[in-house]
């Protein structure tokens, strides 16, 4: 699994952090997404896919 986040698209909603807190965080100053783990373990793949699906700005791309 490869994860790409587009910080220019991110609106700071935080949905990704709620769905996969071990993989995503937000910058303190503006809430923009930060990718914590570029290659998460298989146990987190479903949560990462969910985060990408629910992102209101479509700022997260996941490829296998």
From Swiss-Prot:
Induction / repression: By herbicides.
Cofactor dependency: [3Fe-4S] cluster
Keyword hit for Transport: yes
Presence of the UniProt keyword Transmembrane in the record: no
Domain of life: Bacteria
Note accompanying the cofactor annotation: Binds 1 [3Fe-4S] cluster.
Keyword list, A-Z: 3Fe-4S, Electron transport, Iron, Iron-sulfur, Metal-binding, Transport
Pfam family of the protein (one): Fer4_13
Limits of the 4Fe-4S ferredoxin-type domain: 2-29
Binding site for [3Fe-4S] cluster: 10, 16, 55
PROSITE patterns documented for this protein: 4FE4S_FER_2 (PS51379)
GO MF annotation terms: 3 iron, 4 sulfur cluster binding; electron transfer activity; iron ion binding
Function description: Electron transport protein for the cytochrome P-450-SU2 system.
Name of the molecule in the record: Ferredoxin-2
Organism annotation: Streptomyces griseolus
Name of the gene: subB
């Amino acid at each position: 699994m490869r994860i790409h986040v587009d910080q220019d698209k991110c609106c700071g909603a935080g949905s990704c952090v709620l769905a996969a807190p071990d993989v995503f965080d937000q910058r303190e100053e503006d809430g923009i997404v930060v990718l914590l783990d570029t290659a998460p373990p298989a146990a987190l793949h479903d949560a990462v896919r969910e985060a990408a699906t629910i992102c209101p700005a479509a700022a997260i791309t996941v490829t296998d």
